[in-house]
Amino acid sequence: IAMAPAGGWVAVRGSIDLPMVVLCAAVALWIGAFDAMYGAQDEDFDRSQGLHSLAVSYGAGGAFAISRVLHVTCIACFFALGLMLGLSWLYFVGVGIGAGTLYYQHSIVSPTDFSRVTQVYFLRNGIVSVAICLCAWLSYYV
């Protein structure tokens, strides 16, 4: 999934540039973060099957801590991307909405309560992607 922006970038621009790498890094970090969070609920199963997931290696709490670091780094990459591309203030509003949504994700799911993990995984990540994409697109017209 993180390589999809690279394909679009190269198709449109015909080059591999630093902003494209930062965009791909942001997406990879974002995906890795929510995968760590979602996968933490499988700690017992992963352990019983001899899998080497983050939850097995670091516990559910550790997987959540890693997820937080990845989400913060992801938002930093999206912010840096906006600066590199000279996007307008509206793009940064989208990044702010994304950051707030990711913060909210971490506030409603914990290593001991996965009851809302599906809501986080599908609905909240959809909000992040739509907010950043829509605001990036609109920033070209404002």
Predicted region positions:
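Multi-pass alpha-helical membrane architecture of UbiA-family
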Residues: I1-V142
